Amino acid sequence: DLNDHAAGGSTQATQGGHRYWCARDAMQSALQEPLQPAPSLEQATDQLEVVLQQAIAARMHSPVACGAFLSGGTDSSRVVAMMQAQSALPIEAWTVGFDDPGHDESDWASQVARHLGVHHHLHRMDSRQGLDLLQRLPQVWCEPFADASQLPTLLASELLGARKPVALTGDGGDELF
C-alpha cells in the first residue's frame, strides 16, 4: 500500500516494521489525563528550547552528514544556530537567492552565516533556472500544492543533496509559533 505520511510523523524502516507513535492514540491518551495548569510563557519557552535542541541533536548525531537550508528568516536561522552550537566544526548551510531584490533574503542569510561561523553556500536562481524547475515539478512532487517556496526548496534540496544526505530546515516554524 502507498499512503500519505501522517502529519507530524516520521518513518523509519525496520525489518518487520514498528509503529511507535500515532497522533490519534496520543490525543486519546492525553484526554484521559487530568488537566495540568498551563506553563508560564518562560516555562513554555524553556521547554520549547529543550525540545528543539533534542530534535536537532537526534538528527545531527546520525551516521550520515547533514546540512541546513538558511533563508535568513527567524526559523531557519534558529535551526542553523542550534546546529552550529552542537557542532565542533562549521556546519554547512545552503541559501537560494533571487535577482529580484523584493524576494531576495540572501543578504540576511549571509549575515547570519557569518555571525554563526557556518560554511555558507549561496546560489542565485535566475529566471531560466526557475522555468526549468517549474517544468519538472509534476515529476518531483507526488501531488500539486501552491507554495511559491517549492522552486527554491527544490533547488536547495538538489544542491545540498549532492553533498549531504540530510537537510534540516526551519519549515513549519511560522505555522507552529
List each language-model region with its residue ranges.
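N-terminal segments that mediate ammonia production and transfer
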Residues: 1-39
